[in-house]
Regions:
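Secreted, periplasmic, or luminal enzymes acting at the cell surface/secretory milieu
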Residues: 4-86, 92, 146, 150-154, ...
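Solvent-exposed residues in well-ordered beta-strands and their adjoining turns
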Residues: 61, 78-80, 94, 126-130, ...
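Intrinsic-disorder/low-complexity, polar/charged segments enriched in Ser/Thr/Lys/Arg/Asp/Glu/Gln
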Residues: 70-72, 120-124, 161-163
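Short acidic, flexible loop segments centered on an aromatic residue
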Residues: 82-99, 105-107
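Intrinsically disordered, low-complexity Pro/Gly/Ser/Thr-rich segments with frequent PxxP/GP/PP motifs
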Residues: 99-137
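Terminal connector regions
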Residues: 128-169
């Protein structure tokens, strides 16, 4: 296609913008729904399967972290259905009483695992503390707020199996 073709009507250039400009700022998609307490029809990460899973024995390696450390989230995924399947474990993090506008929770890690029927697998997801930073427009730099955070573990933004409180020192 060239400009000459569209100029002489040999092709029809639609003239439509193929990009999307969001007005929600940082609260796009599931972040908007969660932060504004709006229940969507399907949460982020929701999906259907021919089998059923449960998440259990969910923990972090500790509850206090320094800036150079990693948060290790461990959980087990059991397939309680009759056929083999795959499940995605999702880890979200939220900052309590943030001094800046932030989403209630943000996806920080995930892992897809295959689990045979009536079996379970252990899942480890590591999140560097530096991934909890926010962008400060005034200083044009990334900053990490110290204090309390909540780790949300589940298989979608609306299906949270456990919440764990941690502290960044």
């Amino acid at each position: 296609m060239c400009i000459r073709d569209s100029h002489y009507g040999e092709i029809s250039y639609p003239g439509k913008n193929n990009s999307q400009l969001y007005k929600e700022d940082i609260l796009v998609g599931y972040r908007w729904h969660d932060t504004k307490n709006i229940i969507p029809s399907f949460g982020f990460g929701h999906g259907l399967s021919y089998t059923t899973f449960e998440l259990f024995d969910i923990n972090t390696n500790k509850n206090k972290y320094r800036l150079n450390e990693k948060i290790n989230v461990v959980c087990k995924v059991r397939n309680i259905g009759n056929v083999e399947g795959k499940e995605v474990v999702q880890v979200y993090v939220g900052k309590e009483n943030s001094k800046v506008e932030r989403a209630k929770k943000e996806l920080k890690g995930f892992k897809k695992v295959k689990v045979s029927s009536n079996e379970y697998v252990e899942v480890n997801i590591n999140i560097p503390v530096k991934e909890l930073a926010y962008y400060d427009e005034n200083s044009a730099s990334w900053k990490i707020e110290k204090g309390d955070y909540i780790i949300y573990i589940g298989n979608s933004s609306r299906a949270i199996a456990k919440e764990i409180k941690i502290k960044i020192l």
